[in-house]
Structure formats: structure tokens, C-alpha cells
Amino acid sequence: MLTWLSRTDFDFPPLDKALQEPNGLLAAGGDLNPQRLVAAYRHGCFPWYQDGQPILWWSPDPRTVLFPDELHVSRSLAKCLRQQRFEVTFNRDFRAVIQACAAPRNYADGTWITTPMQLAYQELHLRGIAHSVEVWQERQLVGGLYGLAMGRLFFGESMFSRADNASKVGFVTLVRHLRDAGFVLIDCQMPTRHLHSLGARAISRGEFADYLQRYRDQPPTGDLDF
């Protein structure tokens, strides 16, 4: 049975209560209060819903993650990085990145990054929890991604690209930065061909929960200069 959250109840059900179909649906309702969002990621779930739906909270099994030491950079991508076609920055324009991620795409109907979602994550950014990666070409924003840093874990949310390899360059730059700071895992949530090409793989929900428990409160071991 699906758990419905009230606006005053920040407690999520155990992850093993998530539905098998649709895979990982854990709870519905509540709101996008910053404290609730932080509680959700600490618990192992995330919001994903369309306009007109209640807020839906998910914890899929398996979970797609990337371990920084397993990052795969193809020859063509390595060449692109060496050529320095792009400038990559952190937290220069979070709002522009999340708006670009929310923009309609040719292969999808609508967007799950609703206006309330954008405002909620912008608030997390102001609190130093959510971060953006910007990829620039000739002073134009051509790619980027955003997510949350918590302990030695990074929770990726969405990325976009307006130029070939732009989002991949941003992602690789972020992963290398996180690796140097001692991060152990990047949550990619759901599988995509794009992420698998970069080294992401699936682990069980239980294994993901173990990483959460162990690393969500550990400070980075290196300089996390966002």
C-alpha cells in the first residue's frame, strides 16, 4: 500500500516498502519544503512527478550510481577535453542551469522539473546544499547539470546539452573534482545509455542504503571548492 505524506510528516516509510510496480514508488504527497527534501535524500528517495500529479517519492531497485574511480572517458571524449573547447564552472548560474534542464526536449512530453521544483532546489542552492556545473562556449551556456552534495555523496538530478559533448565534459569535470575531494559515490538514480557510457552501473537498493548510512555524514577528505 502506498504511503501518503502530510505536510507536517517528514518521516518516509522504509525503503523496502517501495512498490515493485511502478518500480520504486515509495510515497506520495507532502511538499517540497527544504527540510523534507534533505530528509528524502538522506533516506534514499527523491521527488519525481509531472504537473497535475501529487508529489511522488521514488527509491528504485536497482539504483544507478557511478563510483568516481570507475569513470570511463572514451577516446573521443578525452580528445574533446584536451582540446579545451569548453569552459567549466561551478555554481556560477544555478538558476540558468535548472531552467535549461527543465526546458522541453524533443524526445519527451512535458517536464518533471516543475516551477515548484525549480524554486525548491534554488532554495537548497542558497543553503549550500545544491550545486550546479556550467559548461560555456564563447560565453554562452551550452551544457550543465545540478545535484546535491551530502557528506561524501553527490546526488545528480538532471543535465542538459546544447552542443556536442557539452554535458559529458561537465559531468567528467565534476566527477574528477568530487573524486579529488574524497567522494565515494554519485547517485544517478535511473539508468540511461548516456550515463552507462561514462561508467555508471546498477547496485541494489540495499547496497545503496548501506552507502547512505556510512557516508552521508562524513565530511569530504579533500578540498570541495564549489
Curated annotation (Swiss-Prot):
The kind of enzyme this is, by top-level EC class, is transferase
Q: Which is a Gene Ontology cellular component entry for this protein?
A: cytoplasm
What compartments host this protein?
Answer: Cytoplasm
List the Gene Ontology MF annotations in alphabetical order: leucyl-tRNA--protein transferase activity
Which InterPro entries does UniProt cross-reference here?
Acyl_CoA_acyltransferase, Leu/Phe-tRNA_Trfase, Leu/Phe-tRNA_Trfase_C, Leu/Phe-tRNA_Trfase_N
Any GO BP annotation? protein catabolic process
- Specify where it is mainly localized: cytoplasm
Give the EC number(s) listed in the UniProt record. Answer: 2.3.2.6
Give the UniProt keywords, A-Z: Acyltransferase, Cytoplasm, Transferase
Q: So what does this thing catalyse?
A: N-terminal L-lysyl-[protein] + L-leucyl-tRNA(Leu) = N-terminal L-leucyl-L-lysyl-[protein] + tRNA(Leu) + H(+); N-terminal L-arginyl-[protein] + L-leucyl-tRNA(Leu) = N-terminal L-leucyl-L-arginyl-[protein] + tRNA(Leu) + H(+); L-phenylalanyl-tRNA(Phe) + an N-terminal L-alpha-aminoacyl-[protein] = an N-terminal L-phenylalanyl-L-alpha-aminoacyl-[protein] + tRNA(Phe)
User: What family is this protein classified in?
Assistant: Belongs to the L/F-transferase family.
What does the UniProt function comment say about this protein?
Functions in the N-end rule pathway of protein degradation where it conjugates Leu, Phe and, less efficiently, Met from aminoacyl-tRNAs to the N-termini of proteins containing an N-terminal arginine or lysine.
The protein here is known as Leucyl/phenylalanyl-tRNA--protein transferase
Native organism is Pseudomonas aeruginosa (strain ATCC 15692 / DSM 22644 / CIP 104116 / JCM 14847 / LMG 12228 / 1C / PRS 101 / PAO1)
What does the record give as the organism's lineage?
Answer: Bacteria, Pseudomonadati, Pseudomonadota, Gammaproteobacteria, Pseudomonadales
